[in-house]
């Protein structure tokens, strides 16, 4: 049985036994919710999400494109792949670089 994580995202149909799954495990989510594109899924149980944004350059009064890469935990019930648009939510630190978890996947 999936639990309510407090975000307006659909509950995955597939079940999993991952302890770090926000729906089927005990991982609480809080803080930021970010959307981005999965650029790598080669790590076991993790994905790299690229977030694009605009940065204002005051000298030229223009915007420039920038991007950042965020490592996120990928629960087996969601199974995000390269090219998918995902929503990731902030959680407690899961490792040295992972402090986000995938909560929604929009297949590409």
Curated annotation (Swiss-Prot):
Keyword line: Ribonucleoprotein, Ribosomal protein, RNA-binding, rRNA-binding
Organism: Methanospirillum hungatei JF-1 (strain ATCC 27890 / DSM 864 / NBRC 100397 / JF-1)
TM region positions: none
The family this protein is said to belong to: Belongs to the universal ribosomal protein uS17 family.
Record-linked Pfam families: Ribosomal_S17 (PF00366)
Full protein name: Small ribosomal subunit protein uS17
InterPro entries: NA-bd_OB-fold (IPR012340), Ribosomal_uS17 (IPR000266), Ribosomal_uS17_arc/euk (IPR028333), Ribosomal_uS17_archaeal (IPR019978), Ribosomal_uS17_CS (IPR019979)
Signal peptide: none
Gene Ontology MF terms: rRNA binding; structural constituent of ribosome
Statement: the UniProt record of this protein carries the keyword RNA-binding: yes
Any GO CC annotation of this UniProt entry: cytosolic small ribosomal subunit
Subunit-level organization: Part of the 30S ribosomal subunit.
Record keyword ATP-binding present: no
Function: One of the primary rRNA binding proteins, it binds specifically to the 5'-end of 16S ribosomal RNA.
NCBIfam families reported for this sequence: PRK08572.1, uS17_arch
One GO BP annotation of this record: translation
């Amino acid at each position: 049985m999936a639990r309510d994580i407090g975000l307006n995202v659909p509950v995955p149909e597939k079940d999993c036994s991952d302890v770090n799954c926000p729906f089927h495990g005990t991982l609480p989510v809080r803080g930021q919710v970010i959307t981005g594109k999965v650029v790598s899924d080669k790590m076991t149980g993790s994905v790299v999400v690229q977030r694009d944004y605009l940065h204002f350059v005051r000298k030229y009064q223009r915007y420039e494109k920038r991007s950042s890469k965020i490592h996120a935990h990928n629960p087996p019930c969601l199974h995000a792949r390269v090219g998918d648009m995902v929503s990731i939510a902030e959680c407690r630190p899961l490792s040295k670089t992972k402090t986000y978890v995938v909560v929604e996947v929009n297949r590409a």
